[in-house]
Design a protein with these regions (language model features):
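Extended oligomerization regions of viral-like shell subunits
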Residues: 147-267
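Structured loops at beta-to-helix junctions and adjacent beta-edge loops in soluble globular domains
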Residues: 49-51, 86, 178-180, 219, ...
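Alpha-helical scaffold segments that mediate packing/assembly in large oligomeric complexes
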Residues: 84-166, 294-295, 300-302
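Extended, compositionally biased alpha-helical segments that mediate assembly or anchoring
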Residues: 241-243, 249-252, 256-302
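Short helix/loop capping segments that flank catalytic or ligand/cofactor-binding pockets
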Residues: 54-57, 93-94, 184-187, 285-287
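Assembly/oligomerization interface modules of large self-assembling protein complexes
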Residues: 2-82, 291
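Short, Lys/Arg-rich flexible segments
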Residues: 2-21, 27, 88-95, 113-120, ...
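A short, structural micro-pattern
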Residues: 40, 66, 77, 169, ...
């Protein structure tokens, strides 16, 4: 029989690998953009703008090319989630222990997935809702902003955001929506047939849906309502999410803790409990904040 010991748990690959793949199912950022391989620690990636090709006439000299580099800095950001379980799991047989591990991973995964969004979108600690200085810039710092008007149709706001992103030379192919804004689109129907105008819009985070020729993802991480210690007023982020450089810098581990008070919930021994903790270290950076526009409702209709 397998014995759970204090410290890192050895999780079979057939359990851990699919779980790692689920990270994107709770994150709008991961749904709309691909991760890139990262080493642990601060890193830099460089993108280049080399301009257009030159026509060379017969017998003419070739001109030099101007290369404009942009450096994207990524820094490690650690998130953890701790859950408590009854102490009896230690005495169970191997099959039951693995079943418990699966349940624990299922509980932890959504929180760690959403943590990526809260960091990228707002630069906050999701446990407290407060800004994390070390995270620096967030997507909500973009100066491309569209204000929702009282009588606006939602697609006019989306169009206006597209215009801002296009003007900065990027393709506005992605949109992450707060559920309250997504439901406005979802409620629109053809006046004659009563068919939905956007049947491909889904209210889930992943896999991506489609909205007005954008890849779409819906999550309350967009507005951070109920999580942020502030009112963001953000209803959507629109733009090229491929300009977000993100990745997992450290493999996830599951640690079993038998002693002490690891989460402020009281002494484990006294409560006949053990705790399980998983950690993930993300890294992210932005090639250009102008690649994204935000739609905000700073003065909601009364």
């Amino acid at each position: 029989m397998a014995t759970l010991e204090t410290g890192d748990l050895t999780i079979p690959d057939e359990i851990l690998d699919p779980w790692l793949g689920k990270i994107k199912y709770g994150s709008a950022v991961a749904t709309l953009s691909n991760s890139i391989p990262m080493k642990f620690g601060k890193g830099h990636s460089i993108t280049f703008d080399i301009g257009e090709a030159e026509h060379v006439g017969e017998g003419a000299n070739k001109s030099g090319s101007t290369v404009t580099p942009k450096t994207v800095t990524t820094a490690p950001q650690k998130f953890q989630k701790t859950v408590r379980w009854t102490q009896e799991v230690k005495w169970a047989d191997e099959d039951h222990q693995l079943d418990v591990v699966r349940q624990i991973l299922d509980l932890i995964q959504p929180a760690l997935s959403r943590a990526l969004d809260f960091g990228v979108f707002h630069g906050i600690n999701p446990a407290t809702g407060t800004a994390v200085t070390a995270m620096g810039t967030s997507l909500s710092d973009t100066t491309n902003s569209v204000e929702v008007g009282d009588a606006d149709k939602p697609y006019t706001n989306l169009d206006a955001a597209d215009v801002l992103v296009l003007a900065d030379g990027y393709n506005p192919k992605d949109v992450a929506l707060d559920p309250s804004f997504a439901s406005v689109f979802g409620g629109l129907r053809n006046a004659t047939s009563e068919q939905k105008l956007y049947p491909d819009l889904t209210y889930q985070t992943s896999p991506a849906g489609r909205l007005e020729n954008h890849n779409s993802s819906v999550s309350n991480t967009v507005g951070a309502v109920g999580v942020g210690s502030f009112v963001s007023n953000v209803k959507a982020f629109v733009g090229d999410f491929g300009t977000i450089r993100w990745g997992i810098q450290r493999s996830l581990g599951l640690e079993m803790i038998e002693y002490g008070d690891p989460d402020g919930g009281g002494d484990l021994k006294r409560n006949n409990q053990i705790a399980f903790r998983a950690e993930v270290v993300y890294g992210w950076g932005f090639a250009d904040l102008d690649a994204v526009a935000k739609i905000v409702d700073a003065v909601p209709a009364v």
